[in-house]
Amino acid sequence: MTTTLQQRSSANVWERFCTWITSTENRIYVGWFGVLMIPTLLAATVCFIIAFVAAPPVDIDGIREPVAGSLIYGNNIISGAVVPSSNAIGLHFYPIWEAASLDEWLYNGGPYQLVIFHFLIGCACYLGRQWELSYRLGMRPWICVAYSAPLASATAVFLIYPIGQGSFSDGMPLGISGTFNFMIVFQAEHNILMHPFHMLGVAGVFGGSLFSAMHGSLVTSSLVRETTEIESQNYGYKFGQEEETYNIVAAHGYFGRLIFQYASFNNSRQLHFFLAAWPVIGIWFTALGVSTMAFNLNGFNFNQSIIDSQGRVINTWADIINRANLGMEVMHERNAHNFPLDLAAGEVAPVALTAPAING
């Protein structure tokens, strides 16, 4: 009899736990995805902060030339970063227990792998948690679909690109100037600015900013007056009110006359779908572009494409970009290569056909 009571009691504890996990009455929804999301994001955050402040230099290129990224080694908020794991590690999984000592793990950039793996798992669980909460509340599932765009971008630069390039040392450093360095080197090696998918991403981000500003300013300019001149317009809205807080007909009429009639949405649902879809689709394409360039399917190359009747090159903007790319490429990892690939792979140009005679 006692055993039966204990089993029922433990079952009740589990049921109460399940109810609490999936309850939408909690101040912050946990959910089953949250059970994995919370510890992974906490681990990534704690490790990132410690490494950003105090990690020793990392041998990122695998040539015994450590690069310092932490604050106590002389960096500031702008120049500091969690430096990617060593090229000597490559794509090997490098947890703490795989290193001979903690010093070796730090020297080879182990914290970078710890942060990005926990971060990506946590972000994927955050997407799942968005779907889970939407499901519990009876909402449509498009919030997590929109979030998939930044998640795809993070996965592209932290996981897909290193896999394609053969080493986590090619992943994006976790810092401000490290991000810029990653972008510059990416342009040098892959000509990303000439890739159509990156162009779509630029259109998505800048267009999304423009449409967001247009929508916000139109709504703010066509609010239904509910207050006096000496009160804030914001007091004219009560949370949960049934009435429209702005006049969509007035906004439609204004914008339709400013541009032309059919440039203005007359359906609020279509408008807000468009505002969500435009940047999301653009960022999807950029993430897809980075993921294909990871395997060296690069941007367009129009270098020396225009020649005159004598076969001489007429320089275009593409040739200027090519020269800039070569300059950026020869400057990065300058001690790791004798020649950058673009310079070493071309045909050999003879410098002198015969040795000069020295008289005297």
Swiss-Prot record:
Q: Which residues cross the membrane?
A: 29-46, 118-133, 142-156, 197-218, 274-288
Q: Where is this site: Cleavage?
A: 344-345
Q: Which residues bind chlorophyll a ChlzD1?
A: 118
Tell me which residues are marked as the site Tyrosine radical intermediate: 161
GO MF annotations in UniProt: chlorophyll binding; electron transporter, transferring electrons within the cyclic electron transport pathway of photosynthesis activity; iron ion binding; oxidoreductase activity, acting on diphenols and related substances as donors, oxygen as acceptor; oxygen evolving activity
- The organism sits in which domain of life? Bacteria
Q: How does it sit in the membrane?
A: Multi-pass membrane protein
Where [CaMn4O5] cluster binds, per the record, is at 170, 189, 332-333, 342, 344
Reaction(s) catalysed by this chain, per the record, are: 2 a plastoquinone + 4 hnu + 2 H2O = 2 a plastoquinol + O2
Can you supply one Gene Ontology CC term for this chain's record?
A: plasma membrane-derived thylakoid membrane
Q: What's a Pfam family in this record?
A: Photo_RC
Where chlorophyll a PD1 binds, per the record, is at 198
Q: Where in the cell is it found?
A: Cellular thylakoid membrane
Report whether Nucleus shows up as a keyword of the record: no
Its PTM note reads:
Tyr-161 forms a radical intermediate that is referred to as redox-active TyrZ, YZ or Y-Z.
Q: How does it assemble?
A: PSII is composed of 1 copy each of membrane proteins PsbA, PsbB, PsbC, PsbD, PsbE, PsbF, PsbH, PsbI, PsbJ, PsbK, PsbL, PsbM, PsbT, PsbX, PsbY, PsbZ, Psb30/Ycf12, peripheral proteins PsbO, CyanoQ (PsbQ), PsbU, PsbV and a large number of cofactors. It forms dimeric complexes.
Q: Any extra detail in the entry?
A: Cyanobacteria usually contain more than 2 copies of the psbA gene.
User: What name does UniProt use for this protein?
Assistant: Photosystem II protein D1 1
Name its species.
Answer: Nostoc sp. (strain PCC 7120 / SAG 25.82 / UTEX 2576)
